[in-house]
Regions:
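Extracytoplasmic c-type cytochrome modules immediately beyond a signal peptide or single-pass transmembrane anchor
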Residues: 39-92
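Structural alpha/beta surface segment adjacent to cysteine/selenocysteine redox centers
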Residues: 110, 115-116, 121-196, 201, ...
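Flexible, active-site-adjacent loop/turn segments at secondary-structure boundaries
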Residues: 52, 58-59, 97-98, 142-145, ...
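Solvent-exposed, acidic/flexible segments
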Residues: 39, 43, 47, 54, ...
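A short beta-strand-turn-helix
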Residues: 89-107, 131-132
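C-terminal cap of thioredoxin/glutaredoxin-like
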Residues: 2-47, 51, 71, 188-265
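Short, flexible turn/loop "capping" segments at secondary-structure junctions
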Residues: 102-103, 150, 230
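Short amphipathic alpha-helical/adjacent loop interface patches that line ligand
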Residues: 58, 124, 217
Length: 265
């Protein structure tokens, strides 16, 4: 997930404003400490000095932007932790979601995903490896079809496959088989897995399946999720699919085991 252009622009503007203010204070102190007031300074001259200084030292702007990014991320993580705690039952133990790995595991890893999300597809091997390597992880899968009707059809097919005991197999093949995930692909994959395709197509219309999608969407909105994938490990959050996703997942699983989590997870 990337910051929206508007947010990035706002951050840069905030950095510049902060630098101008800081530079003004420094100049006042250097010019006449305790005597010269900020209001008596030549504003244009100060702005010009700051502009010239930034032009010669652009790395300062980068450093300030990086620091703002860190603070914003920390604030967002803190807010998300509270939201996770307030919605722990629906996030970790909803009967509408499906669980892979150990259903009685001691740590829950929740993934929000879309079958047409390239980053979700890239993350799949790390998620599968986590479940295979750690027999105590409980993987809660939240279908969040944000890429339109084709994604929604694929999600419904996967949820319908659960009625025939093949949810996780269907889940993996929808990611690994080439081509866009849509209804046609889902039905073909279902046939390859030996499912009753006619029954699956009928089960896709089950109101409980739509309820599952609606619940995941509502939770994503509460969490402020702007894209997929998103991982919750207890009340720890991993947005997107970083290159070291497996390492981050195992680290946070270990943290939850050692320290617990604020949410009832």
């Amino acid at each position: 997930m990337n910051l929206k252009t508007g947010l990035a622009t706002a951050l840069v503007a905030a950095v510049v404003a902060a630098l101008v203010t800081a530079a003004t204070i420094v100049l006042v102190w250097r010019l006449a400490p305790g005597v010269v007031k900020v209001s008596s300074l030549d504003e244009k001259r100060v702005v010009g000095i700051v502009h010239d200084y930034l032009a010669k030292n652009p790395e300062i702007l980068v450093e300030m932007t990086t620091e703002l990014d860190k603070r914003t991320a920390a604030e967002q993580a803190e807010k998300q932790q509270k939201i996770v705690g307030d919605n722990a039952e629906a996030i970790f133990r909803s009967p509408l979601a499906h669980v892979a790995g150990n259903p009685n595991g001691d740590v829950s890893v929740v993934e929000f995903f879309d079958y047409n999300c390239g980053f979700c597809r890239r993350a799949l091997p790390d998620v599968v490896k986590l479940v295979q390597d750690d027999g105590k992880v409980r993987l809660v899968l939240k279908e969040l079809p944000i890429f339109g009707e084709e994604s929604e059809a694929a999600a419904k097919a996967a949820l319908a496959a659960a009625k025939q005991g093949k949810y996780f197999e269907m889940h993996q093949k929808l990611f690994t088989e080439p081509g866009k995930a849509d209804k046609d692909k889902a039905l073909r994959v279902a046939g390859e897995l030996g499912l009753d395709v006619a029954q699956l197509e009928k089960d896709m219309q089950d109101p409980e399946i739509q309820k599952s999608l609606d619940e995941a969407k509502e939770l994503a909105q509460k969490l402020g999720l702007q894209g997929t994938p998103l991982y919750l490990i207890g009340d720890r959050v991993i947005p997107g699919a970083p290159d070291d996703l497996y390492d981050q997942l195992t680290k946070k699983v270990a943290e939850v085991r050692e320290k617990g989590c604020k949410a009832t997870c």
